[in-house]
A protein has these predicted regions:
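Sec-dependent bacterial lipoprotein signal peptides
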Residues: 1-17
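Kelch-like beta-propeller repeat domains
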Residues: 19-346
Length: 346
């Protein structure tokens, strides 16, 4: 065969290889699907809580000067939003926490544009009414985390206007009282929490401009120290399992849990900020304490969104893609972890 023919064949092979479609490894699979937009204004730094099969989302910031007090109920069975009773106008805020305890929703702490807050409110689905409860005893703050387990609610970490915090408090709705509890992790704000099997997981966040990398689980059934440290979320160990942990660390992220996937029961962490606003998504396996990269969030890079989950389904709602009112989102996305990414289905 002549040198000319060899060159022609090699050139054709290079063209054919370069024209092959890009494929995503299985570890980067999963598909994002657009669902019904929030009926209210676009916003970021809103809160949400789940009661039964419904998600409740409200408060937040319009990117300019307005904090919201409105609240909305999402029914995933019919993919629709309906407005419920707003919080009092005086309770408008952003960067608060939302949680649920025994069929009631709670919202507390946050920022109203002028002051950091420590007030605490209860929502009753039966009366469609808000009632002010005992103020959060940890002091005014925003960008904290909150969750409910069993008969109690918990709020901790955050920023008080001067410093990042690491304290945690337990709320007893039957007595309307707060009790301080220990937390073994680092100070942080703009972290996330999620619940699985009556345990709370706290991860990500930032302190003094540094993204934190420690990861903790809270088990209220344990005696003594209820917190257990899990594997760090960066390339921290001398082993190889975390060599690819390039951008799990972040702030202002969203998280949710989906049970019964092909890979078991999983948590997902997506969006947020890591030097810039990002779209990367990671899967956490409760059984192995390991993370795997999944398909990027298909909306614009987003920060300050609400991650939530109803039975076997996970969602990300609202958030911002930049500065100003036009960058505030009213979108809702659902993540399908067992699906193959299709970038053309939205």
């Amino acid at each position: 065969m002549s040198q000319k023919n060899i060159s022609s064949i090699l050139g054709l092979w290079i063209i054919l290889v370069s024209c092959r479609p890009n494929t995503i490894p299985y570890t980067e699979n999963g598909d994002w699907i657009v669902r019904s937009q929030l009926n209210g204004p676009g916003r970021s730094e809103a809160v949400g809580f789940t009661i039964g099969s419904f998600e409740y989302l409200g408060t937040g910031w319009d990117g300019l000067n307005t904090r919201f007090s409105d609240f909305w109920k999402y029914d995933p069975a019919v993919d629709s939003w309906s407005q419920i009773q707003s919080m009092p106008d005086s309770a408008a805020r952003s960067s608060a926490v939302g949680l649920s305890i025994n069929g009631k929703g709670y919202v507390g702490t946050g920022y109203d544009g002028y002051n950091y807050l420590n007030d605490f409110w209860e929502y009753d689905t039966l009366s469609n009414a808000w009632t002010r409860k005992a103020a959060f005893s940890g002091g005014a703050r925003y960008e904290a985390v909150g969750f409910g387990i069993g008969n109690y609610g918990y709020i901790g970490t955050g920023f008080d206007g001067s410093y990042a915090l690491k304290d945690f408090y337990r709320y007893d709705p039957s007595a309307d009282t707060w009790t301080v509890i220990d937390f073994s992790g680092n100070k942080r704000y703009s972290a996330v929490s999620f619940i699985y099997k009556e345990k709370a997981y706290v991860v990500t966040g930032i302190n003094s401009g540094v993204l934190v990398n420690d990861f903790w689980v809270y088990d209220p059934s344990l005696s003594g120290n209820n917190w257990t440290e899990l594997r760090h979320i960066n390339n921290y160990s001398t082993e190889t399992y975390d060599d690819g942990y390039s951008d799990i660390v972040r702030s202002n992220a969203s998280a949710f849990v989906i049970t019964g996937t092909k890979s078991g029961d999983l948590a997902f962490l997506s969006t947020g900020e890591n030097g810039s606003i990002i779209s990367t998504t990671w899967e956490y396996n409760f059984a192995t304490d390991l993370w795997s990269r999944k398909s990027n969030f298909e909306g614009p890079p987003t920060s300050g969104a609400v991650g939530f989950y109803v039975p076997n389904r996970g969602f990300i709602a609202t958030g911002r893609s930049g500065n100003g009112q036009a960058a505030q989102s009213d979108f809702l996305w659902e993540f399908l972890p067992d699906a193959v990414l299709n970038p053309n289905d939205n």
